[in-house]
């Protein structure tokens, strides 16, 4: 896979200890970036650090649903370096159930992490980007946010809202050298599939014309390009990577 020039850039990747986030982390490091990964699970963060073994990689234990704490963490980071790139990747699927059987607590938890977490991280990081007149933000949404997945109302709704947030923030920052994009991957073989029933996984795969799940490196390459200085004109846009499932 080709590399993009991210030298002298610092990237913050939420949910960076596993799945999409872990693969994006490796891609960014190979492209020369300094990378800070966030996750709520410190053991997974420490394991990621050991696996990669790169001096340009560091971590913070962070709950993206808690604005006060992550804002304080960002302020501490900004004392040492600017955050040039923000990848909002942290997310959960929640249970598989019809809307009328979906618990209020489960609904709120999915929205808190997937939507509010994205809002919180943008709110904390953007002021420093504005001050430096540079930034790249990529929000990891989902094809479910475009098409809606049956029995996944909270997840689909949260990811649809992330697309609206991306378009809004992108327009608000369009007059500055800060670009905001979202990507809408279809299902990939990550731990998030373990939260779903086999029936639901087979249903997801049946809707992908390419007939397979997304490879992690395919997404990380797209995210890396979107995060590079080369990608300077596009903003408030959604980039599809669903194997033909969604064509808009």
Protein language model regions, located:
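Short C-terminal tail/terminal secondary-structure segment
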Residues: 2, 93-96, 147, 224, ...
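Canonical Rossmann dinucleotide-binding motif of NAD(H)/NADP(H)-dependent dehydrogenases/reductases
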Residues: 4-34
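Substrate-binding pocket helix/loop in short-chain dehydrogenase/reductase
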Residues: 97-99, 103-108, 193, 204
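Active-site helix of classical SDR
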Residues: 122, 158, 166
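Alpha-helical segment proximal to the catalytic Tyr-Lys
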Residues: 127, 171-175, 232
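Residue(s) in the substrate-gating loop at a strand-loop-helix junction
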Residues: 142
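Short, small/polar-rich loop/turn modules that mediate ligand/substrate recognition or access, typified
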Residues: 174, 179, 215, 234-236
């Amino acid at each position: 896979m080709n590399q993009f020039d991210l030298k002298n850039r610092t990237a913050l990747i939420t949910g960076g200890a596993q799945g999409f986030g872990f693969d994006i982390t490796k891609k960014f490091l190979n492209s020369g970036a300094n990378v800070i990964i966030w996750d709520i699970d410190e053991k997974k963060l420490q394991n990621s650090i050991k696996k990669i073994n790169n001096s340009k990689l560091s971590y913070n234990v962070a709950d993206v649903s808690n604005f006060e704490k992550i804002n304080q963490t960002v302020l501490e980071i900004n004392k040492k370096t600017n955050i040039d790139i923000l990848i909002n990747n942290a997310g959960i699927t929640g249970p598989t159930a019809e809307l009328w059987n979906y618990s209020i607590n489960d609904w709120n938890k999915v929205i808190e992490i997937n939507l509010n977490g994205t809002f919180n991280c943008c709110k904390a990081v953007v002021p420093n980007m504005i001050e430096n007149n540079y930034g790249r933000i990529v929000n990891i949404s989902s094809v479910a946010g475009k098409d809606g997945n049956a029995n996944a109302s909270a997840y689909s709704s949260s990811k649809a809202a992330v697309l609206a947030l991306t378009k809004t923030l992108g327009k608000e920052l369009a007059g500055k050298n800060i670009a905001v994009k979202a990507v809408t991957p279809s299902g990939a073989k990550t731990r998030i599939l373990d939260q779903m029933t086999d029936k639901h996984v087979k249903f997801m795969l049946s809707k992908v014309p390419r007939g397979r799940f997304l490879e992690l490196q395919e997404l990380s390459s797209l995210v890396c390009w979107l995060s590079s200085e080369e990608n300077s004109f596009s903003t408030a846009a959604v980039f599809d990577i669903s194997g033909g499932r969604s064509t808009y």
